[in-house]
Amino acid sequence: MKRKFYIIGHNPNSVRNAIRCLKDGANAIEPDIRYLPQYEEKFFVYDLLTLDRKQRSLRDYLIGLSAALNDEKLNLALLAFDLKPICSKDFESESVLYMKEFFEQLNEYFFSTYSQLPLLLTVGKPSGKPLLVKAKPWLTANQAVGVDEGDTPENVKDFFTREDMSFAFADGTSSPFASPLKFKPIIKEAVTLKQHTHELKLVYTWTANSEKTMRNFLDLGVDGMITGRVSRLRKLIDTEYHDTIEMATAEDNPFA
């Protein structure tokens, strides 16, 4: 059986960039979410660490993405959101309300139309895991949570297994001064763990831009990669790896 795979567009924090990633061959996107309660919209899609710092409301992003998917024949198989900032002490006291309002927007402006599409919510620090637990009342069978930086597969497994939640694991770097291959041992550990536990559903890495890095992680058995070179990774999968890997579709549930 071929391995279902997710090419995840890197920082598609505008609908235009998201659609470009999908047209280039991605089947997943992971925009950044910031919570700014001082504004009426509260949830915004942008990242302070990227060049594109324009604040776009989550509402407008979801409406635009939904409309674009309706107009274009694109294969979006997974919608992931990287939740930032993680959890300050002030933030923790609002986390229940945060998740309630977050899912209200997700369901009203997107999942009311695309309910079959899998959803993944991630945080980039171990301290963010309690926030993800607050999402539990709203998660459905094709939705899960995960940690994508600064943790270990075993710690993530222990935490979310206790909470009876399906989860994903990732690690990597976008730094020009460090190779994602530095994280190969911990990703290998996660892939091995996935083979032995039902709860760990998805293992991926970031940001894989060179063919060497892509091949290393494809051979390792990951389920996906975040990349800024979508067409390069897609070509590699469609040629050298087409016998063992196939692109997931919206009908596939990685969290089943």
Q: Language model features by range: what are they?
A:
Residues 1-256:
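Phosphate-group recognition and catalysis centered on beta-loop-alpha active-site segments
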